[in-house]
Amino acid sequence: MNHKEILDQLVPIVIEQTPRGERAYDIYSRLLQDRIVLLGSPIDDHVANLIVAQLLFLESQDPDKDIYLYINSPGGSVTAGLAIYDTMQYIKPDVVTICMGQAASMGAILLAAGAPGKRYALPHSRIMIHQPLGGIQGQATDIIIHAEEIKRIKEMLIDILAKHTGQPKDKIANDIERDYFMSPYEAKDYGLIDKVIEKRE
């Protein structure tokens, strides 16, 4: 049994009473009814497709009502993360972002990409930004091509962070040279979030 199969067996089932009797949901489907989307894993193409599908579904249900994206992710694939990012910017509803645990790498970019004034973190979470990572093998010409692509992606991510934080691009470029960890309060000062929340208001 692989890791995913084990996790699938551990997903709680919620039983609800309806006029037609009992109805069982997995916990994620039940949260989706309340417009809550959970990003709680490394970001790969499969995870990104699930998140994007949920965002598009919730927009079709009600284009004027906020969507709540809870993030606890170490980051992952840049292209997969950018698929989520672009969808967040594309859809009509505001996407409220809430960091719990950690939002690192692409997770931090998605956190910052929430609707202005609606980006939050819980008090013991952590946020980390850094430059994109690349492990390339192959012929010298291919390595050069991939190195140029990594530089292009790095500039794109700097532009995105500058847009959502208000920080100068040269400061961001310097800060992401190495892993740059922040407490929620430091992330607020940096412009990655708008507020640290301890209790639901």
UniProtKB/Swiss-Prot annotation:
Q: Where does this protein chiefly localize?
A: cytoplasm
What is the catalytic activity of this protein?
Hydrolysis of proteins to small peptides in the presence of ATP and magnesium. alpha-casein is the usual test substrate. In the absence of ATP, only oligopeptides shorter than five residues are hydrolyzed (such as succinyl-Leu-Tyr-|-NHMec, and Leu-Tyr-Leu-|-Tyr-Trp, in which cleavage of the -Tyr-|-Leu- and -Tyr-|-Trp bonds also occurs)
Q: Where in the cell is it found?
A: Cytoplasm
Enzyme Commission number(s) of this protein: 3.4.21.92
Q: Where is the signal peptide?
A: none
Q: Name one molecular function that GO assigns to this entry.
A: ATPase binding
Please explain the role this protein plays, according to its UniProt record.
Cleaves peptides in various proteins in a process that requires ATP hydrolysis. Has a chymotrypsin-like activity. Plays a major role in the degradation of misfolded proteins.
Its recorded name reads ATP-dependent Clp protease proteolytic subunit
Gene3D superfamilies in the cross-refs:
2-enoyl-CoA Hydratase, Chain A, domain 1
Q: Which gene encodes it?
A: clpP
**EC primary class:** hydrolase
Tell me which species this is from: Aquifex aeolicus (strain VF5)
| Residues annotated as the enzyme's active site | 105 (nucleophile), 130
Q: Which UniProt keywords apply?
A: Cytoplasm, Hydrolase, Protease, Serine protease
Question: Pfam families under this entry?
Answer: CLP_protease
Record family assignment: Belongs to the peptidase S14 family.
Which biological process annotations from GO are given for this protein? protein quality control for misfolded or incompletely synthesized proteins
PANTHER family in UniProt: ATP-DEPENDENT CLP PROTEASE PROTEOLYTIC SUBUNIT (PTHR10381:SF70)
GO CC, alphabetical: cytoplasm; endopeptidase Clp complex
How does the record describe its quaternary structure? Fourteen ClpP subunits assemble into 2 heptameric rings which stack back to back to give a disk-like structure with a central cavity, resembling the structure of eukaryotic proteasomes.
